[in-house]
Amino acid sequence: MNKHLQQVRELNDSFSLPQAEQGANVRLTDMDLVAHQALLMEQGSQILKAIKAGEMVDILTGLVNLGYCALAAIATQGGDVIDSPVNWKHDGFVVSIMRILSDKINQCTSGSSTDYSAVYGLCAHLSRRFINADFDKALQIIIESKMTRQLKAPDLSDCLYE
């Protein structure tokens, strides 16, 4: 099992959040699908606003939160992360980021672990290749803040390699 998914599953268990048994791969209910899609779209919007503002830490926070939301959807289903290559290269234009984020989020309307995995993989890839940050460390910080129920998003500036 993917280490980040394992951490999300442990967080869900600690708060008694509903999730299928690992490996069950149950289909999301329509309402679960709508709820997860709303979260993904909200996080996608936050990333685009951060890109517009040029705030690297906020972009990283958005990418990590979006990746977390994708992992949470996979955990709810009892699925596993499916590794797939990310087909994005920095072309100097942020519009390419907007397009690929929007496309990957939209594909999650299928409710498939494969599509949620693609969003998670894209977030990790963009964090490393576009932001030049430590996605693993940033996600760990986000999960720890959720575990302690911090309301304010943690500062991820230490996760940037600059």
Label for each model-derived stretch:
Residues 1-162:
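Flexible "arm" and connector segments at domain edges
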